[in-house]
Amino acid sequence: MDDVEMKVMEMKMISKMFQGILDACSAKCISKYNEGDLNVGESVCAERCVQKWMETFKKVQSKMSGTQPGQEVPQEAPAAAPEKKGWF
């Protein structure tokens, strides 16, 4: 699998996760779309729902990769960024 195919697959997974969060949390927290903005209760509910969804996702991901929940998956060390000079 080349780099482009991996990036496409990663974007599909992210999109699927986002859609799952959107479906689950909007169905749970938003009963009617009467206003342009969420009220306080809807906003708090949605925030908690997304937080729980992400915590669950991290736990499942750590189980699948074989790491402990607080442990980070080792990644490649980032290349040293070139020194920036001036405004840009």
Swiss-Prot record:
A motif (Twin CX3C motif) lies at residues 25-49. It is a peripheral membrane protein. It is found in: Mitochondrion inner membrane. Residues 68-81 have a biased composition (Low complexity). GO terms for biological process: protein insertion into mitochondrial inner membrane. Its main location: mitochondrion. SUPFAM superfamilies: Tim10-like (SSF144122). The twin CX3C motif contains 4 conserved Cys residues that form 2 disulfide bonds in the mitochondrial intermembrane space. However, during the transit of timm9/timm10 from cytoplasm into mitochondrion, the Cys residues probably coordinate zinc, thereby preventing folding and allowing its transfer across mitochondrial outer membrane. Belongs to the small Tim family. This is Mitochondrial import inner membrane translocase subunit Tim10. It comes from Dictyostelium discoideum.
